[in-house]
Amino acid sequence: MTAYDPDNIFAKILRREIPSHTVFEDETALAFMDIMPVVDGHCLVIPKVAARNIFDVEPEDLAALVKTAQRVSKAACRAFQADGHTLRLHSETSGGQEVFHIHFHVLPMKTGVPLRPRVMGDHAMLARHAAMIREAF
């Protein structure tokens, strides 16, 4: 398996080298808006530890990440009045992973509303959505 790359985009976001629309942060994790959202409120939850995928992360770090993903999911669903949600974790290219730093996709879902194609989101909209989720905690 390929080693963790400390220059991946999420590592750069953690180091504040690249801006993001932050939803939540604590000592173990960071949640921010996906820049190519497939639904309103689509955000990502990443650990602050360097781990390529689920096979590389320590169990206690994974547990903390899942706890944060649950909190963010609840807030995102409240913010967007979702009647369901999807929580995704992809590992490696064949599993759909595109950024090789373990992360969960949080997708607040509404019945009858399909996923959109992955296209760059408007930054003003992403900032508004991040604020809506932060207010829902």
Language model region names:
Residues M1-F137:
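HIT superfamily nucleotide-processing domains
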